[in-house]
């Protein structure tokens, strides 16, 4: 019978349930006596098993996850193109909201770039992945600017700047035939 101090000491250990079909009995009677054998159910091993849940991550999976993060903005570009097509070029609430969201997401991602690069630190190709991430966000921002230009929201013509042009000075004043 196990003492209370042994039970407390064994509480932190991880044990493994296993049934060994090749041995004489499923409870491993060769290791334990008959009285102690009745304490454990069938298939329970009282030997400590190494903790497999806290192992080193597989290098291939880490690289794949880092590339998924880096390629995320590029994967959004086809959806942004579809949204641009569906929104049209008219100026109304819906297309303007779509353009604002298309511009806001890359800006927000570019502002959070240091946090994203911390996720890429475990990768061996972090410079290339960071460059791909940056290019993808800049392409998303360029699409939003292009959509603003195609909707006529960017001041690209001289008539857009009339409020800032000084009115021309009059060179002469003319009047009618009446004297006042």
Swiss-Prot record:
Chief site of localization: endoplasmic reticulum
Keywords attached to this entry: Endoplasmic reticulum, Membrane, Transmembrane, Transmembrane helix
Name of a matching Pfam family: EMC4
Cytoplasmic membrane side: 1-63, 118-124
Top-rank taxon, per record: Eukaryota
Membrane topology qualifier: Multi-pass membrane protein
KW Endoplasmic reticulum (keyword) present: yes
Spans through the membrane: 64-84, 96-117, 125-145
Subcellular location(s) per record: Endoplasmic reticulum membrane
An example Gene Ontology biological process: protein insertion into ER membrane by stop-transfer membrane-anchor sequence
GO cellular component: EMC complex; endoplasmic reticulum membrane; membrane
Membrane topology, Lumenal segments: 85-95, 146-180
Disulfide-linked positions: none
Family (UniProt): Belongs to the EMC4 family.
Subunit structure: Component of the ER membrane protein complex (EMC).
Chain's role: Part of the endoplasmic reticulum membrane protein complex (EMC) that enables the energy-independent insertion into endoplasmic reticulum membranes of newly synthesized membrane proteins. Preferentially accommodates proteins with transmembrane domains that are weakly hydrophobic or contain destabilizing features such as charged and aromatic residues. Involved in the cotranslational insertion of multi-pass membrane proteins in which stop-transfer membrane-anchor sequences become ER membrane spanning helices.
Name this protein carries in UniProt: ER membrane protein complex subunit 4
Name of the coding gene: emc4
């Amino acid at each position: 019978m196990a003492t209370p101090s042994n039970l407390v000491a064994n509480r932190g250990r991880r044990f493994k349930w296993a049934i060994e079909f090749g041995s004489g009995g499923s409870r491993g009677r060769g290791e334990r006596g008959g009285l102690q054998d009745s304490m454990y159910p069938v298939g329970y091993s009282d030997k400590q098993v190494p903790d497999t849940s806290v192992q080193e991550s597989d290098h291939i999976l880490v690289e794949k996850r880092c590339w998924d993060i880096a390629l995320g903005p590029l994967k959004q570009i086809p959806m942004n193109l579809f949204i641009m097509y569906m929104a049209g070029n008219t100026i109304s609430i819906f297309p303007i909201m779509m353009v604002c969201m298309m511009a806001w997401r890359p800006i927000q991602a570019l502002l959070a770039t240091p946090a994203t690069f911390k996720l890429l630190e475990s990768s061996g190709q972090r410079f290339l992945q960071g460059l791909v991430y940056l290019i993808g966000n800049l392409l998303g921002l360029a699409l939003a600017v292009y959509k603003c230009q195609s909707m006529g929201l960017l001041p690209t013509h001289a008539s857009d700047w009339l409020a800032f042009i000084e009115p021309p000075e009059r060179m002469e004043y003319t009047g009618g035939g009446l004297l006042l």
